[in-house]
Amino acid sequence: MWERSRYVGAVAASGFAIIAAACGGGGSSVASETPAQVLAAAVSATKGATSYEISGTGSFSGGISSFDLKVVGTSISGSFVTSGAAIQLVELADNIYIKAPASFYTAAGASSAGAALLAAAWVEIPAGSSYSSDFSSLSNFSDVSSQLADAGTVTSDGTGTVNGQSVVFIKDTGGTVLAVASSGTAYPVQVKETGTTAGTYDLSNWNSIPTVTAPPNPLQLPSS
């Protein structure tokens, strides 16, 4: 259901490949709908959303233990923790900006002086550069509706409460469980995965995230 592995698998691909309730207005209850109808309602709701926040914790590949990202259209801002290093991130107009501690850059092979220089500022990875392709999996988080639409066959997994929100649970054949708001707009509230890439994603703040802006005065990596 949720192609998280494509995203986190790109995180440590190279020195700069860092990648790295539900609330809403009207809408009818999905509490009495079939699992397929619940999924369709969640896909429709996410397609109509202008922004949202997604956060996660778990044992992710690339050493990632947590992330918190705000998505506005195709733009993303937020942070993640990988191998103990907290990284700030902005993606805007296909440009990637990161701010990381010196330890992150020295682990990637930078000299102490170079790492200190990079850590003191935001670093811009220009669109079309050889480094930017390492961040292509970020699109997974700016297109939740497509991720949900790939769920395939789903079955009912009961009802409950997640983050104070009444939800309906549905489960795909791989064991991933999706919690969908059972009243109001059928926004996804949480995704839980099991197995080797086990993790939990919370989705919230639908249609209420401010516009993403570029950080000031970034250092720019070469375009090649």
Predicted segments with their positions:
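C-terminal motif of bacterial Sec signal peptides marking the signal peptidase cleavage site
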Residues: 19-22
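Sec-dependent N-terminal signal peptides
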Residues: 6-16
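Subset-of-secretome marker
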Residues: 2-8, 24-224
